[in-house]
Amino acid sequence: MKLRNKFNKVTAWILTCILFFTMAFSITSEAYGEGYTHAKQFKNCHIYNGIDVSTWNKQIDWNAVKASGIDFAFIKVGGRGWGSAGTLYHDSRALENLKGAKAAGIKIGVYFFSQAITEKEAAEEAQYTINYLHTYGISIDLPIAMDFEYASDSPTGGRLRTANLTREQATNVCLAFCSYVATRGYTPMVYANKSMLTNDMNASTIASRYPIWLAQYNSSATYTGAYSYWQYTSSGTVPGIEGRVDMNFYYSTDGSFSSKINIPVPTGETAPADAKIVYATHIQTYGWEKEETYDGGISGTVGQAKRLEAIKIRNNTGIEGSVEYQVHCQSFGWMDWTMDGDIAGLTGLAKRLEAIRIRLTGQLAEQYDVYYRVQCQTYGWLDWAKNGQTAGSTNYAKRLEAIQIKLVEKGGMAPGNTSKVYVSPLIGYNTHVQTYGWTGTVFDGTTGGTTGHAKRLESISITNLTETSGNVVYRVHGQTYGLSLIHI
């Protein structure tokens, strides 16, 4: 993590003097932070000393780091390349650092160097980070941070800079990362420097929901927004680390560390003990349902035009096995499979669920089939899907409004009709139009191109979207060139 445009020593000294008398206080910590001035809102906080590291810090003697007075460390687990491809990568020393810091008794959090330019990419980065922790069985004490900054190693500032996102777009990208992390039970956090927080995003919107990690390399932080961590230099020296290292303060109101948050859950009566499958949905405007639903009951709303935004399902039979479920979410597409009461979908982003798949595992799958049907915008109640089939729609931008889920003894009769469980386009086509270029894919009889604009069609691409084998074969007659080759 790097910053530009540092104050020179004279400016920093002047600001320190001014802020000392008007809005701040100074402390000298046990080992670090001498001469740094903290904003007055942190006067009653416990202030911890920490670092953040990556492969660039080489091999670290974590016992020496701990002995020197370092309380916590944020460790890079990976990042996204700043080139146009935006390839995800892992930090080669992440696992070594995570295990070493933890063994030394240092509180740990993680960060991911983001170059996300869409909400979907941001969720992908969050998913990558959490999957990394789960793969290696790493438990953390501090938040999962999105390192949102322009690429200082790139002459152009990287793909994040060249994307030229609006403040609203950048804010939504950060919120997408945070929402994904939060729905998985971790505390998310956004790292950014003062300039980005002030000029390139709506930091107050983010800070109203999630902690901020400020980067500002001064002897006092002049950023006036809310923040919980302050990275105050990239030139620190710590025993056990070769060369310079990023240094941080953490302001704790109660003296504790935590990487988990309390996810809102249904607060009303729980399902009866003899219920087989239990579920709850997060509904537009209303949030989580007050009571859980079970065994074929309707979860959600009917006739109110409210989208489902997230869902939790759990096995209540006592039989070995799990309920696994996967949702298709607006802007994000198919998300990871989730299981046994974990949240699928996203809350706080106003994104609709569009389709769902549910399946069983273990002894549960041997004894039961799972049936489910959804109330879908425009189409109403679809028929009952079974054992991993897709229920709902994709490519039509239609919201799910309600769902029923039921376990049926293996081979037993379905709860109702099973013929129409999923609505999807049969054919998609994209046209290239004079002046406008490619206009975007449309489906099943919708007009592609323009009318009334006197613009010529210059090219077309047609795709078979059915699950039936075979191809769409087409050719066009073009000005000057006549009939084209056959396209498949």
Q: Which residues are covered by each model-predicted region?
A:
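Fold-core signature of tandem repeat domains
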Residues: 277-283, 308, 313-315, 323-328, ...
